[in-house]
């Protein structure tokens, strides 16, 4: 009897292999992170671009703990009952940025649907603390959707970071499978609302390789432009563990280049599109 093997994941292509991070700036920052036990997504997420970003003086920090109230099929962050809020966290993050001498900081967080404010007060206080301690550091905030509650989003607007980002993550058809507790249109409305309230630069990101079609990617990019989003990042989805959604396809560099060209034609200020692109890749140039 012939054995049929199903759902064999595609082999990882050569273009996803990266060099080990090197360089004086990287070595200095790595030493500081280890010495002071600083919490960066760059290290905890084993980002392939860590060496390049640190070399340019950019780093990403996660606030509000490391346990998320949502269980997205793509994300490697732990799901469950989050820790209590650390009200000293804003000062700790600001101090980390000062120690590392970061020129451009990206702040992100888990979803905190357990909190009435969605964590927005800590978000606002973190931005303010960074401003006080690091007046020359520019900021990007990669925020959750706050369940679309405007008063919580308004706290981000009031803090006025240079860039506010909220990721769509995938195309409309796959949203329920990929982000079960999120809504495609709600995310678009968050991005549209941020722009309407006066945020200078808005940004979003999507992952490819989850089974989307080219036309669905184009439509998502059009939806983002219709919401007046300025910057889009497009990268390859990589499965964190076997419990997460499988990779359906590895997108070629040529197709990523095609999406970049289309995004520029649509009028995005910046388009980062490539296999290793992540939300905060080249983030420092997105304020320009």
Curated annotation (Swiss-Prot):
- Catalytic reactions on record: [[Fe-S] cluster scaffold protein carrying a second [4Fe-4S](2+) cluster] + N(6)-octanoyl-L-lysyl-[protein] + 2 oxidized [2Fe-2S]-[ferredoxin] + 2 S-adenosyl-L-methionine + 4 H(+) = [[Fe-S] cluster scaffold protein] + N(6)-[(R)-dihydrolipoyl]-L-lysyl-[protein] + 4 Fe(3+) + 2 hydrogen sulfide + 2 5'-deoxyadenosine + 2 L-methionine + 2 reduced [2Fe-2S]-[ferredoxin]
Reading the lineage from the top rank, the first entry is Bacteria
InterPro entries reported for this sequence: Aldolase_TIM, Elp3/MiaA/NifB-like_rSAM, Lipoyl_synth, rSAM
Annotated [4Fe-4S] cluster 1 binding lies at 42, 47, 53, 280
- Which cell locations does it reside in? Cytoplasm
Q: What is its EC number?
A: 2.8.1.8
Residues forming the Radical SAM core domain are 54-269
A GO MF label: lipoate synthase activity
Q: Which GO terms describe its cellular component?
A: cytoplasm
* Note accompanying the cofactor annotation: Binds 2 [4Fe-4S] clusters per subunit. One cluster is coordinated with 3 cysteines and an exchangeable S-adenosyl-L-methionine.
Gene3D superfamilies the UniProt entry points to: Aldolase class I
Question: Per UniProt, where does [4Fe-4S] cluster 2 bind?
Answer: 68, 72, 75
> Does the record's keyword annotation contain Disulfide bond?
no
Required co-factor(s) are: [4Fe-4S] cluster
UniProt main location, coarse: cytoplasm
Q: Which UniProt keywords apply?
A: 4Fe-4S, Cytoplasm, Iron, Iron-sulfur, Metal-binding, S-adenosyl-L-methionine, Transferase
Question: What family does this belong to?
Answer: Belongs to the radical SAM superfamily. Lipoyl synthase family.
UniProt-listed HAMAP family: Lipoyl_synth
This chain belongs to which protein, by name? Lipoyl synthase
Species of the source: Flavobacterium johnsoniae (strain ATCC 17061 / DSM 2064 / JCM 8514 / BCRC 14874 / CCUG 350202 / NBRC 14942 / NCIMB 11054 / UW101) (Cytophaga johnsonae)
């Amino acid at each position: 009897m012939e054995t049929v093997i199903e759902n064999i994941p595609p082999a990882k292509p050569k273009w996803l292999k990266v060099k080990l991070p090197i360089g004086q700036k990287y070595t200095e920052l790595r030493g500081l992170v280890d010495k002071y036990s600083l919490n960066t997504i760059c290290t905890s997420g084993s980002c392939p671009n860590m060496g390049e970003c640190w070399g340019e003086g950019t780093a990403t920090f996660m606030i509000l703990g490391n346990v998320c109230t949502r269980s997205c099929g793509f994300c490697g962050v732990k799901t469950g009952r989050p820790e209590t809020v650390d009200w000293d966290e804003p000062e700790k993050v600001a101090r980390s940025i000062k120690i590392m001498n970061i020129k451009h900081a990206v702040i992100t967080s888990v979803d905190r649907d357990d909190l009435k404010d969605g964590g927005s007060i800590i978000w606002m206080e973190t931005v303010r603390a960074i401003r006080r301690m690091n007046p020359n550091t520019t900021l990007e905030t990669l925020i959750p959707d706050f369940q679309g509650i405007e008063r919580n989003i308004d706290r981000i607007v009031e803090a006025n970071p240079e860039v506010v980002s909220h990721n769509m993550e995938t195309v409309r058809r796959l949203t329920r499978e990929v982000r079960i507790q999120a809504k495609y249109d709600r995310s678009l409305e968050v991005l549209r609302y941020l722009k309407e309230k006066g945020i200078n630069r808005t940004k979003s990101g999507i992952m490819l390789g989850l089974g989307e079609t080219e036309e669905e990617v184009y439509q998502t990019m059009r939806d983002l432009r219709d919401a007046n989003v300025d910057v889009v990042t497009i990268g390859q989805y990589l499965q964190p563990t076997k419990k997460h959604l499988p990779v359906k396809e590895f997108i070629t560099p040529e197709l990523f280049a095609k999406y970049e060209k289309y995004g520029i034609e649509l009028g995005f200020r910046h388009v980062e599109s490539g296999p290793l692109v992540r939300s905060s890749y080249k983030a420092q140039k997105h304020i320009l």
